């Protein structure tokens, strides 16, 4: 074939010299240690630590007690994955074998052992157990 002939006639100029790669590896190893860690707080300078928000007490929830369609999708997907990986099922099975159907049944009966964390604009967050959230579109 013509492709095979082109391969054998290929100039060696198309390939990178192996010695150039070794130079790059050696340069990375010669970096001083003080560049990788900051002596003040022992944190890599490429990371920025954010202050953790504070939890809003359960009695002072600001957001609505309705589960959004996005939260519902995330809860169902997460719970279905857990069930598929062998997590114990929280409802009586009536012949269901599909993990997603089992997760839907658990959600309808409010037996999903998942807590939804809603972040607020001020950096704080609210934790809502799925049992406390109302499902709108069943």
Curated annotation (Swiss-Prot):
<feature type="region of interest" description="Disordered">
    <location>
        <begin position="1"/>
        <end position="46"/>
    </location>
</feature>
<dbReference type="GO" id="GO:0005666">
    <property type="term" value="C:RNA polymerase III complex"/>
</dbReference>
<keyword id="KW-0240">DNA-directed RNA polymerase</keyword>
<dbReference type="GO" id="GO:0005665">
    <property type="term" value="C:RNA polymerase II, core complex"/>
</dbReference>
<dbReference type="Pfam" id="PF01192">
    <property type="entry name" value="RNA_pol_Rpb6"/>
</dbReference>
<dbReference type="GO" id="GO:0005736">
    <property type="term" value="C:RNA polymerase I complex"/>
</dbReference>
<protein>
    <recommendedName>
        <fullName>Probable DNA-directed RNA polymerases I, II, and III subunit RPABC2</fullName>
    </recommendedName>
</protein>
<comment type="function">
    <text>DNA-dependent RNA polymerases catalyze the transcription of DNA into RNA using the four ribonucleoside triphosphates as substrates. Common component of RNA polymerases I, II and III which synthesize ribosomal RNA precursors, mRNA precursors and many functional non-coding RNAs, and small RNAs, such as 5S rRNA and tRNAs, respectively. Pol II is the central component of the basal RNA polymerase II transcription machinery. Pols are composed of mobile elements that move relative to each other.</text>
</comment>
<dbReference type="InterPro" id="IPR018247">
    <property type="entry name" value="EF_Hand_1_Ca_BS"/>
</dbReference>
<dbReference type="InterPro" id="IPR006110">
    <property type="entry name" value="Pol_omega/Rpo6/RPB6"/>
</dbReference>
<dbReference type="GO" id="GO:0006366">
    <property type="term" value="P:transcription by RNA polymerase II"/>
</dbReference>
<comment type="similarity">
    <text>Belongs to the archaeal Rpo6/eukaryotic RPB6 RNA polymerase subunit family.</text>
</comment>
<dbReference type="GO" id="GO:0110044">
    <property type="term" value="P:regulation of cell cycle switching, mitotic to meiotic cell cycle"/>
</dbReference>
<dbReference type="InterPro" id="IPR006111">
    <property type="entry name" value="Rpo6/Rpb6"/>
</dbReference>
<feature type="compositionally biased region" description="Acidic residues">
    <location>
        <begin position="1"/>
        <end position="27"/>
    </location>
</feature>
<dbReference type="GO" id="GO:0003677">
    <property type="term" value="F:DNA binding"/>
</dbReference>
<comment type="subunit">
    <text>Component of the RNA polymerase I (Pol I), RNA polymerase II (Pol II) and RNA polymerase III (Pol III) complexes consisting of at least 13, 12 and 17 subunits, respectively.</text>
</comment>
<keyword id="KW-0804">Transcription</keyword>
<dbReference type="GO" id="GO:0042797">
    <property type="term" value="P:tRNA transcription by RNA polymerase III"/>
</dbReference>
<dbReference type="GO" id="GO:0003899">
    <property type="term" value="F:DNA-directed RNA polymerase activity"/>
</dbReference>
<feature type="compositionally biased region" description="Acidic residues">
    <location>
        <begin position="35"/>
        <end position="46"/>
    </location>
</feature>
<keyword id="KW-0539">Nucleus</keyword>
<dbReference type="InterPro" id="IPR020708">
    <property type="entry name" value="DNA-dir_RNA_polK_14-18kDa_CS"/>
</dbReference>
<dbReference type="InterPro" id="IPR036161">
    <property type="entry name" value="RPB6/omega-like_sf"/>
</dbReference>
<dbReference type="InterPro" id="IPR028363">
    <property type="entry name" value="RPB6"/>
</dbReference>
<dbReference type="GO" id="GO:0006360">
    <property type="term" value="P:transcription by RNA polymerase I"/>
</dbReference>
């Amino acid at each position: 074939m013509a492709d095979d002939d082109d391969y054998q006639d290929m100039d060696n100029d198309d390939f990178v010299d192996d010695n150039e790669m070794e130079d790059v590896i050696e340069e990375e190893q010669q970096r001083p240690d003080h560049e990788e860690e900051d002596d003040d707080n022992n944190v890599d300078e490429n990371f920025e630590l954010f202050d953790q928000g504070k939890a809003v007490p359960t009695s002072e929830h600001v957001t609505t007690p309705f589960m959004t369609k996005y939260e519902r999708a995330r809860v169902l997907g997460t719970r279905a994955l857990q069930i598929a990986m062998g997590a114990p099922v929280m409802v009586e099975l009536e012949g269901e074998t599909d993990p997603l159907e089992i997760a839907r049944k658990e959600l309808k009966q409010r037996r999903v052992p998942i807590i939804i964390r809603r972040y607020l604009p001020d950096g704080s967050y609210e934790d809502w157990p799925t049992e406390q959230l109302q499902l709108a579109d069943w």
